[in-house]
């Protein structure tokens, strides 16, 4: 999946004496900037790096876009994180993970089936 958007997006790396977090964003049209991937190096998770990177995106793009959007699985780990970052649920794409991956995807013991989109005004 990553190869579908990596070359059309912009990658950002948060470097704090070494890489801590990265993300890729794409212009989805109609004023929507989408976070396609955000990941924090495991030893540095839950230390505010991903939230700081999201805030950097908000500041950088608030005059160019009207909405920052992210799609994720309905996981007890990711949904609350994005909600704490100011995102609200927008819509879902049924069966996204089962239709686009040749193997089951699990996060925190939850089998991911639908893609949940969350949005934050910029």
Describe each region flagged by the PLM.
Residues 69-71, 83, 88-111:
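Conserved catalytic-core motifs of GNAT/GCN5-like acyltransferases
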Residues 1-42, 54:
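Acetyl-CoA-dependent GNAT
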Residues 31, 66, 88:
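Short acidic/polar active-site loop segments enriched in Thr and Asp
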Residues 44, 48-56:
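Conserved acetyl-CoA pyrophosphate-binding loop and the N-cap/start of the following alpha-helix
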């Amino acid at each position: 999946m990553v190869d579908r958007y990596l070359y059309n997006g912009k990658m950002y790396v948060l470097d704090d004496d070494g890489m801590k977090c990265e993300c890729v964003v794409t212009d989805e049209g109609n004023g929507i900037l989408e976070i396609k991937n955000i990941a924090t190096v495991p030893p540095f998770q839950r230390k505010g790096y991903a939230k700081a990177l999201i805030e950097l995106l908000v500041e950088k793009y608030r005059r160019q876009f009207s909405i920052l959007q992210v799609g994720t699985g309905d996981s007890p780990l990711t949904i609350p994180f994005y909600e704490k970052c100011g995102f609200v649920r927008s819509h879902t794409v049924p069966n996204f993970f089962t239709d686009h991956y040749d193997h089951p995807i699990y996060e925190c013991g939850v089998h991911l089936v639908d893609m949940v989109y969350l949005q934050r005004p910029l």
